[in-house]
Structure formats: C-alpha cells, structure tokens
Swiss-Prot record:
Keyword Transmembrane attached: no
Gene Ontology MF terms in the entry: DNA binding
Homology family: Belongs to the VapB family.
Oligomeric and partner information: Homodimer. Forms a hetero-octamer (4 VapB and 4 VapC) complex with toxin VapC. The complex binds 2 different sites in the vapBC promoter, probably via VapB dimerization.
Ranges of residues in domain SpoVT-AbrB: 3-45
Signal peptide annotation: none
NCBIfam families with a match to the protein in the record: TA_anti_VapB
Protein name as it appears in the record: Antitoxin VapB
Organism per entry: Shigella flexneri
Free-text function comment from the UniProt entry: Antitoxin component of a type II toxin-antitoxin (TA) system. Upon expression in E.coli neutralizes the effect of cognate toxin VapC. The VapB/VapC complex probably regulates transcription of its own promoter.
InterPro entries: Anti_VapB2-like, SpoVT-AbrB_dom, SpoVT-AbrB_sf, VapB_TA_antitoxins
Induction: Degradation of tRNA(fMet) is induced by chloramphenicol treatment, suggesting the antitoxin is unstable when the growth rate decreases.
Length: 75
C-alpha cells in the first residue's frame, strides 16, 4: 500500500491510510531503519508479537544437512 510523506514542523511525517492505521491507544512508536526501509511498531512491543506468536512447525529443519564432527586440538 502506498501513502505520502510530508513535512510537519520541519520533521518528516507519514500519513497512514485507515486500512493500516495503528490502534487508537497507540500514542508512541519505535522506528527501525534497515537501509532505506523503515519499520514502525508500537513503542515497547517490537518483539512481543514475535515471541507470543506461533512457534515453528514440527518438521522445521527435519532434514537439515550437517557436516561431520570436526576433530580439534584441545586447549
């Protein structure tokens, strides 16, 4: 979804369309910069949804190929 960026009191602002608006109770956000990408999340909740979400499926990396054990000198 595309939207507009504009200046408000010499700061950049982003107009969020209704379809992607934050909940009304969100008053502060965190902005994470990854290259030219910006990720906006409610302040203090950046990882909450990730950890509260579904875990990986039972077959996740079931057929993971690993090299054999290495023999190393002990310290």
């Amino acid at each position: 979804m595309e939207t507009t960026v504009f200046l408000s009191n010499r700061s950049q602002a982003v107009r969020l369309p209704k379809a992607v608006a934050l909940p009304e109770n969100v008053k502060r956000v965190e902005v994470i910069a990854v290259g030219r990408t910006r990720i906006i999340t409610p302040a203090g909740e950046t990882w909450d949804e990730w950890f509260d979400g579904h875990s990986v499926s039972t077959d996740f990396m079931d057929n993971r190929e690993q090299p054999g054990m290495q023999e190393r000198e002990s310290f």
